[in-house]
Amino acid sequence: MPIRSAHHDQDATTALTAGRLPRNLRSFLKSITFRVVQTRDELIAAARLVHHEYAKRGYVTPDNSSSEIKLSLFNALPQTTTFIALFEDEIIGTVTLIPDSPLGVPMDSIYRDELDGLRRQGRRLAEVSMLAVRTDLFGRGVFLMLNSKKLFLVFNLFKLMFDYTRFLTSITTLCIAVHPKHDLLYRFLFFHDLAGERVYPGANRNPAIAKILDLHLAVEECRAANKLGIYRLFVEKRSKPEQLAQKMLLTPNDLQYLFTEKTRLFPQSSAEQIRHLQQCYPSYQFQEILGTGSHHS
């Protein structure tokens, strides 16, 4: 898989400010397909990539790694959307968008008060979650902002997610909990601080900081920042309709396999959580999905 550069860029962000990408970077990006997940196999492959990369960094604990895929109850919601980058039909990057719901969002577990403050303002939230890239393709130990191929792979995944959010949803504000070492990347993408560093049990007790992005304000900030490359990528250029088409709809069989059999997330969920899922899928027979004799039946 000919992705790794012969050397690491020392000014990978220059192209974003100048507005023109080097030829080798344009060629690399043309070889990648960016789109939404369309099948169960793709969702599993994306979840496996997340688990693999998170395990390298100590973000998953042994007790939640036995299935070797990283899924949460939020992945069962029909509004949740997973985006992927494919090279020769293999997923090499992924990110997931989790719109707010009665179940909240994952980072409510440590930033509930701050997020509730945004909700009271009328903000319609969605959390950016489960970002992962196949690091073995780009060389190890290299800061993301100094590797142009890896950086632009992430940026194009975010571009697709931004377009989906801006044009196909009513979401106003993106939120994310990230390791402090990644703060610079999100500042570069016009995310602002929401709350300071806290221990995140959901990431194996690693530190996290909370950041938010106002979608309307970000467009104006991007225009004013004189970063022509970012403006062209994220504002002027529009994702193609086929990149966002045929989004996967989880079937009863998918729900049973992924969340009852593969991960046991449904059996471990509260009755209230299962009731909300039943409301999301009113035609589905949840007694069958949960298994005979489930305590939720």
PLM region descriptions:
Residues 2-4, 20-71, 79-84, 91:
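Short amphipathic alpha-helix that is part of the acyltransferase structural core
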Residues 101-107, 111-217:
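Acyl-donor binding region in acyl/amide transferases
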Residues 90-94, 126:
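Glycine-rich phosphate/pyrophosphate-binding loop shared by adenosine-nucleotide-utilizing enzymes
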Residues 1-14:
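Extreme N-terminal leader/anchor segments
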Residues 265-297:
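C-terminal non-catalytic accessory extensions
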Residues 198-259:
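Accessory, usually C-terminal, subdomains that scaffold auxiliary metal cofactors
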